[in-house]
C-alpha cells in the first residue's frame, strides 16, 4: 500500500503517470498508423470488389474479385467478433515472434493493430458506400481512370466520414490499451492496475481516469471539428 504521507508521493505520482501517458500515446498512435494504412485498403477493397464495383474484375477475372471480397469480409467479421482480452492471449505466440516479447508497450502494438484493423476497415467501407453513386457515374462519363475515381472521388468525398471513423477508432484503441496495460503492456492501464488497484491508491486511479477521459474528449473533438470542416454539406 502506498503511503500518502510520503513527501515524495506526489512527485512519484507525476513521474509514474507521465511515463504511463507517454507509453499509452506511443502504443496507440503506432498501432493507429498500421490500422489506418491496412484498414483503408481493406475497407476500399470490400466496396470496390463487389458486384458492379470499381475493381469487380481484377485482372479481368470476376471470380478473383468475388473471392477477394468474400475472404476479406470473413476475415473482418472474425476480427470484430473476438473479444479483445481473448485476442490478446491468442496472439501471444505471434507477438513474441514479431517483437521478441509479449509484454511492454512495443509488444502491445501487435494486438492493438490486429484489433483495430477490422474495426476501422468496416468504418471505411461504410464511409465509401455513402458516396453518392451519381458522383461516381459523372466521373466515369468524363473518362476518369479507376485510379482517379478511387482517390479523387471515392476517398475524397468520404473524408468527413473517414475522419469520424478514425476518431472513433482512436477512442477504441485507447480503451484497448488500458486492457493491455493490465496484463503487462504498460501505459495508463498498467498504472491504474499496479498503483491504483494492487496498492490501493485512489489518487493514482482518479488521475488515470481523468487523463483517459480528457484524452478521449480531445481526440473526439478534433475528429468532429475536422469532419465539419471537410464536409461538403
Please report, for each region that a protein language model flagged, where it lies by residue:
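Loop-to-helix entry region at the N-terminal start of transmembrane alpha-helices
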Residues: 19-28, 77-80, 84-119, 204, ...
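Transmembrane alpha-helix signature in integral membrane proteins
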Residues: 17-48, 52, 166
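Cytoplasmic-entry segments and transmembrane alpha-helices of multi-pass inner-membrane transporters
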Residues: 45-90, 112, 123-126
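Periplasmic/extracellular loop-to-transmembrane helix junction in inner-membrane transport proteins
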Residues: 1-32, 57-70
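Short helix-to-coil transition segments within interhelical loops
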Residues: 128-158, 185-186, 198
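C-terminal transmembrane helix and the adjacent membrane-cytosol boundary/short C-terminal tail
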Residues: 45-52, 141, 205-233
Amino acid at each position: 500500500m502506498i503511503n500518502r504521507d510520503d513527501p515524495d508521493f506526489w512527485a512519484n505520482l507525476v513521474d509514474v503517470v507521465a511515463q504511463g501517458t507517454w507509453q499509452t500515446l506511443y502504443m496507440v498512435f503506432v498501432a493507429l498508423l498500421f490500422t489506418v494504412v491496412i484498414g483503408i485498403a481493406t475497407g476500399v477493397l470490400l466496396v470496390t470488389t463487389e458486384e458492379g464495383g470499381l475493381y469487380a474484375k481484377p485482372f479481368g477475372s470476376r471470380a478473383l474479385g468475388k473471392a477477394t471480397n468474400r475472404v476479406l469480409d470473413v476475415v473482418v467479421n472474425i476480427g470484430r467478433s473476438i473479444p479483445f482480452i481473448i485476442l490478446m492471449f491468442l496472439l501471444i505466440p505471434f507477438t513474441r515472434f514479431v517483437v521478441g516479447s509479449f509484454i511492454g508497450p512495443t509488444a502491445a502494438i501487435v494486438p492493438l493493430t490486429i484489433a483495430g484493423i477490422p474495426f476501422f476497415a468496416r468504418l471505411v467501407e461504410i464511409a465509401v458506400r455513402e458516396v453518392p453513386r451519381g458522383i461516381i457515374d459523372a466521373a466515369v462519363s468524363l473518362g476518369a481512370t479507376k485510379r482517379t475515381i478511387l482517390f479523387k472521388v471515392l476517398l475524397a468525398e468520404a473524408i468527413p466520414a473517414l475522419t469520424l471513423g478514425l476518431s472513433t477508432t482512436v477512442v477504441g484503441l485507447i480503451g484497448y490499451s488500458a486492457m493491455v496495460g493490465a496484463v503487462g503492456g504498460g501505459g495508463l492501464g498498467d498504472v491504474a492496475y499496479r498503483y491504483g488497484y494492487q496498492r490501493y491508491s485512489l489518487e493514482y486511479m482518479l488521475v488515470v481516469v481523468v487523463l483517459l477521459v480528457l484524452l478521449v474528449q480531445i481526440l473526439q473533438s478534433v475528429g468532429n471539428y475536422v469532419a465539419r470542416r471537410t464536409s461538403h454539406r
